[in-house]
Amino acid sequence: MKISILGAGAWGTALALQISRRHQVSLWTRNQAHIVDMQVTRANLQYLGDFAFGDQLAVEGDLGRALDGADLIVSVVPTNGFRNALKEIKRLGCDAPVVWASKGLEAATAKLPHEVAQDELGDSRHWGVLSGPSFAAELVRGLPTAVTLAANDAEFAARAGAMLHGGNFRVYTSTDVIGVSVGGALKNVLAIAAGISDGMQCGNNARAALITRGIAEMTRFGVALGGAKETFMGLTGAGDLILTCTGQYSRNREVGLRLANGQTLQEILKTLGHVAEGVHTAREVVKRAGQLGVEMPITQEVDQVLSHGRSPRQAMENLLSREQKSEAL
């Protein structure tokens, strides 16, 4: 089988390396200099280090060639580039099913990736989302990783999951596309909050409180959109949130840490080297939550820090001074 992976960042490349152990893989990016570098070195030195590409992994700069003969497309482009990627897939006449690993909400529309897929591909085409607690640096080293593939069709979810599953990479399946998408988007925003807390030396108790109240926030938002409550206690909810709020490779947590240490957002993004989806997602989540009438105090404070000049200390004080209430969702 041939699997086409769109996006040659750390996670796209880690997936390409993992999947190419069992299938032919075409890894595409539009950055010509990056393509040449990967073709010459047979590694992604820019984003992932010197993990060597095998014979079944081809690097492509031409999207048409990358998609030619594909049995499955896996899009790992940032959320704000996802719609354009789908438009290009349609323009080239490729009818292979699409799975994406983007985690966020589209800027301006505040749409989740599955809503973008509905806009561009419709419901008749098979598509799904791959998400869960997964750092590229660990997967590529052969460390055990478990994720969930949720799709608009249960049979397709099982089939696509079987294509990606193997060895140290466990792929569970689901049909709760909404819940899985929300978990992936919200955990990035909440990880910024956890980073701020850690950067301010608020301690382990505070981090645990942010994570658990973050799960409540994530669940309220997801259920209001039509997701299943139990999804948020699984890999793509609690699992991904815990990892992203505590792990050393978390870009979103790093943003929070550096904000707490006095750096401006512009300084952080200039030197981060990778996309931190939570930065762009917070504003869109607040917008969508307002439309739904869902209370999201942690996300709102993160948005205030990122986009409205509120200090991390003031944001933390605002959360601590909230009225006492029941722990219920």
From Swiss-Prot:
Database matches in Gene3D superfamilies: N-(1-d-carboxylethyl)-l-norvaline Dehydrogenase, domain 2, NAD(P)-binding Rossmann-like Domain
Instruction: Write out the catalytic residues in the record.
Output: K187
**First-tier enzyme category under EC:** oxidoreductase
Residues that bind sn-glycerol 3-phosphate? K103, G132, S134, K187, D240, S250, R251, N252
Q: Which SUPFAM superfamilies match?
A: 6-phosphogluconate dehydrogenase C-terminal domain-like (SSF48179), NAD(P)-binding Rossmann-fold domains (SSF51735)
Its Enzyme Commission number?
1.1.1.94
What family does the database annotate? Belongs to the NAD-dependent glycerol-3-phosphate dehydrogenase family.
Function recorded in the entry: Catalyzes the reduction of the glycolytic intermediate dihydroxyacetone phosphate (DHAP) to sn-glycerol 3-phosphate (G3P), the key precursor for phospholipid synthesis.
State the protein's name. Glycerol-3-phosphate dehydrogenase [NAD(P)+]
